[in-house]
């Protein structure tokens, strides 16, 4: 049997936006009413995505980490879910600064991420419009989903599957670039040797 592809995903966002609820909804198809928002957890999950077995390691960050912890999590992850609460404008405004930190830590690589507006079931208390979420996702050059970890509204499974697909696509592109670059170095070395021999 072929070895499964391994993907490391990390969930970021302000405390209370529903990161843990989102992960638990994805893994168990259930909603948890009570949990400790200060706990950080790592989950393992295996799924078949586009006929390939993928092993996900999902880091659910507490949202209250210090800078060193957060940067460590960002270095660890390959794909990122940035979550805000549609009823909390402050959580939405924290997304761009988070992305900027990610860019700084991951450079020169492009960051693979998905933007998620959670708590879509609380539309009556909405502070962030769907259009604002879409506009930010365009700025961040990433996919955007609105969902509810509480009701299961929105395709939560697709959020995680799409992020895995994107991580694997980026890996393939980087692998091809690396191979091309090493082939170029070999060609340059041979040309230098031939130049020396002929001179």
Curated annotation (Swiss-Prot):
EC number: 3.6.5.2
GO cellular component: cytosol; fibrillar center; nucleoplasm; nucleus; plasma membrane
UniProt keywords, alphabetically: Cytoplasm, GTP-binding, Hydrolase, Nucleotide-binding
Location in the cell: Cytoplasm
Catalytic activity from the UniProt record: GTP + H2O = GDP + phosphate + H(+)
InterPro entries from the UniProt entry: P-loop_NTPase, Ras-related_GTPase, Small_GTP-bd, Small_GTPase
Binding residue positions for GTP: 13-20, 60-64, 118-121
Keyword Nucleotide-binding: yes
GO MF term list: G protein activity; GDP binding; GTP binding; GTPase activity; nuclear estrogen receptor binding
Induction (free text): Up-regulated by estradiol. Down-regulated by tamoxifen.
Tissue expression notes: Detected in heart, brain, placenta, lung, liver, skin, kidney and pancreas. Detected in estrogen receptor-positive breast-derived cell lines, but not in estrogen receptor-negative cell lines. Expression is decreased or lost in a significant proportion of primary breast tumors with poor clinical prognosis.
Short name of any one Pfam family annotated for the protein: Ras
SMART domains referenced in this protein's UniProt entry, alphabetically: RAB, RAS, RHO
Coiled coil: none
Domain of life of the native organism: Eukaryota
GO biological process: negative regulation of cell growth; negative regulation of cell population proliferation; response to hormone; small GTPase-mediated signal transduction
Family: Belongs to the small GTPase superfamily. Ras family.
PANTHER family: RAS-LIKE FAMILY MEMBER 11
Function: Binds GDP/GTP and possesses intrinsic GTPase activity. Has higher affinity for GDP than for GTP. In cell lines overexpression leads to a reduction in the rate of proliferation, colony formation and in tumorigenic potential.
Protein name per the record: Ras-related and estrogen-regulated growth inhibitor
């Amino acid at each position: 049997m072929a070895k499964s592809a391994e993907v490391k995903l990390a969930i970021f966002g302000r405390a209370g936006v529903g990161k843990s609820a989102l992960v638990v909804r994805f893994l168990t198809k259930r909603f948890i009413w009570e949990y400790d928002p200060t706990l950080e957890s790592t989950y393992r999950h295996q799924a078949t995505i586009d006929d390939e077995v993928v092993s996900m390691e999902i880091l659910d960050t507490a949202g209250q980490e210090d800078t060193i912890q957060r940067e460590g999590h960002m270095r660890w992850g390959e794909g990122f879910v940035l979550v805000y609460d549609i009823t909390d404008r402050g959580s939405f405004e924290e997304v761009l600064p988070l992305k900027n930190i990610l860019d700084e830590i991951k450079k020169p690589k492009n960051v693979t991420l998905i933007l998620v507006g959670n708590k879509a079931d609380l539309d009556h208390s909405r502070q962030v419009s769907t259009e604002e979420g879409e506009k930010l996702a365009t700025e961040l050059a990433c996919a955007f989903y609105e969902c509810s970890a509480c009701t299961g509204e929105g395709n939560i499974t697709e959020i995680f599957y799409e992020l895995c697909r994107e991580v694997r696509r980026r890996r393939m592109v980087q692998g091809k670039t690396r191979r091309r670059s090493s082939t170029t170095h070999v060609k340059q070395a041979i040309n230098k040797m031939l130049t020396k021999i002929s001179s």
